[in-house]
UniProtKB/Swiss-Prot annotation:
Main function: p43 is a 5S RNA binding protein which is a major constituent of oocytes and comprises part of a 42S ribonucleoprotein storage particle.
Name of the protein: P43 5S RNA-binding protein
UniProt zinc finger (C2H2-type) residues: 15-39, 45-69, 75-100, 106-130, 136-160, 163-187, 191-213, 220-245, 251-275
Claim: RNA-binding is one of the keywords in the record: yes
InterPro entries referenced in this protein's UniProt entry, alphabetically: TFIIIA_Zfn-C2H2, Zinc_finger_trans_reg, Znf_C2H2_sf, Znf_C2H2_type
Pfam families assigned to the protein according to its UniProt record, in alphabetical order: TFIIIA_zf-C2H2, zf-C2H2
The organism of origin for this protein: Xenopus laevis
KW Metal-binding (keyword) present: yes
Recorded GO MF terms: RNA binding; zinc ion binding
C-alpha cells in the first residue's frame, strides 16, 4: 500500500492500489481493500434470490444487486425541488454532498499545481496530464494497450483471461463475451417456468416470462358478426380480418414460380427466407403509437378496434358489424329527448348493409 499525497484542509493521505497497471487511490483503507477484491478472479458472493445465479467479487456489489431485486427506493432527497430517491443512506449522503452541499476538494499533489477537484475521477484524469502517461496500462507481457479509463482496462484484461463458462463442470474459456454466449446456448436447458413448463437458458429471460403470467392478457374480439375469435394484439386482429374476412392478400412473393401471397408485409418478409436459406430472419421493427409524446408516468390509451380497422371495412360495404360497435354511437341521440326512445342499433345497422349500387341510385334520385 502506497501513500501518494495529501489533500484538503485535513491533509488526508491518499492510498494507491498496489496492483500493477492500476492507479486507483482512496482515502480509506477499507475502500482500498474492497477495490483490490475486484482484481481477484474469485467471486465468493452469490445472490440468494430465487432463479438468480449471479456472483460478485465485492460485498457492496451484491448488496446493491439485491436491493435492485427488492426495489427498495424509500429515501428521498430532503432538498426542495429535488425528486431523487435512493436505496441506501450512503447514496443519499453522497448525493447531498456533491449535488447540494460543499464537498471537500481533492487537491492535486503535484508541486506547483493548485488545481482541486470534487471527484476522484476528475483528479485521476488530471494527473495523466502531468505525467503524460495514461492512467491504465495493461501489465500482460507483450501487450502495449493503454487507456485513460480504469473501466476499459478491466474490460481489456478480461480478454487476456477469457470468459469462463458458468455451468458446473464446464471448463470452457471463450476469448470474447459473444463467443461465450454462443457456447452457453449449447448447454441443455436447465431453467423452467413453474406455470407453463417452458424452458429457458437465461435467468433474466425466465424472470421476464414470469411477468407475462401476472399480466392480464389483452382481448380484442373480431368485429364481424358471425366470428367469435379474440386476439391479444391489434396486429393479429388486422391480419385475421384482412386474410379471412376481406381476402386482401395484396403482398405477393416476387420470386418467379412462387404463387404465395400474404395479407401483411411482415408475413412476406418471413416467407422470403424460404427462397434464400442463407439469409437471416429479419428482426421486424413495429412502429409504436404516440405514447412517447404523453410524457413519463402515463399509460398509452388502449387502441380501439374500430379506429384501427376502419380503413379495412370501407373497402367492402357488405361487412356486417356486431351490434356492440353501434352502441358506441348512442351518445349522438342524447342531445335532445325524444318522445319514443330510438334504438341506435336499429337505426344504424342499415348503413353497413347497403350495397354500393343501391346507395348511388338513392343519391341520384
Amino acid at each position: 500500500m502506497k501513500n501518494v499525497g495529501e489533500t484538503g484542509p485535513g491533509k488526508c493521505q491518499l492510498l494507491r492500489c498496489p496492483a500493477a497497471g492500476c492507479k486507483a487511490f482512496y482515502r480509506k483503507e477499507g475502500k482500498l481493500q474492497d477495490h483490490m477484491a475486484g482484481h481477484s478472479e474469485q467471486k465468493p458472493w452469490k445472490c440468494g434470490i430465487k432463479d438468480c445465479d449471479k456472483v460478485f467479487a465485492r460485498k457492496r456489489q451484491i448488496l446493491k444487486h439485491v436491493k435492485r431485486h427488492l426495489a427498495l427506493k424509500k429515501l428521498s432527497c430532503p432538498t426542495a425541488g429535488c425528486k431523487m430517491t435512493f436505496s441506501t443512506k450512503k447514496s443519499l449522503s453522497r448525493h447531498k454532498l456533491y449535488k447540494h452541499g460543499e464537498a471537500v476538494p481533492l487537491k492535486c499533489f503535484v508541486p506547483g499545481c493548485k488545481r482541486s477537484f470534487r471527484k476522484k475521477r476528475a483528479l485521476r484524469r488530471h494527473l495523466s496530464v502531468h505525467s503524460n502517461e495514461p492512467l491504465s496500462v495493461c501489465d500482460v507481457p507483450g501487450c502495449s494497450w493503454k487507456s485513460s479509463s480504469v473501466a476499459k482496462l478491466v474490460a481489456h484484461q478480461k480478454r487476456h483471461r477469457g470468459y469462463r463458462c458458468s455451468y458446473e463442470g464446464c471448463q470452457t474459456v471463450s476469448p470474447t463475451w459473444t463467443a461465450l454466449q454462443t457456447h452457453v446456448k449449447k448447454h441443455p436447458l436447465e431453467l423452467q417456468c413453474a406455470a407453463c413448463k417452458k424452458p429457458f437458458k437465461k435467468a433474466s429471460a425466465l424472470r421476464r416470462h414470469k411477468a407475462t403470467h401476472a399480466k392480464k392478457p389483452l382481448q380484442l374480439p373480431c368485429p364481424r358478426q358471425d366470428c367469435d375469435k379474440t386476439f391479444s394484439s391489434v396486429f393479429n386482429l388486422t391480419h385475421h380480418v384482412r386474410k379471412l374476412h376481406l381476402c386482401l392478400q395484396t403482398h405477393r412473393c416476387p420470386h418467379s414460380g412462387c404463387t404465395r401471397s400474404f395479407a401483411m408485409r411482415e408475413s412476406l418478409l418471413r416467407h422470403l427466407v424460404v427462397h434464400d436459406p442463407e439469409r437471416k430472419k429479419l428482426k421486424l421493427k413495429f412502429v409504436r403509437g404516440p405514447s412517447k409524446f404523453l410524457g413519463r408516468g402515463t399509460r398509452c390509451r388502449t387502441p380501439v378496434v374500430e379506429e384501427d380497422l376502419s380503413h379495412l371495412f370501407s373497402r367492402k360495404l357488405l361487412f356486417h358489424f356486431k351490434t356492440r360497435l353501434e352502441t358506441n354511437l348512442s351518445g349522438l341521440f342524447n342531445e335532445r329527448q325524444l318522445r319514443e326512445p330510438a334504438e341506435p342499433e336499429v337505426n344504424l345497422s342499415g348503413l353497413f348493409q347497403r350495397p354500393q349500387g343501391r346507395a348511388k341510385a338513392e343519391k341520384s334520385a
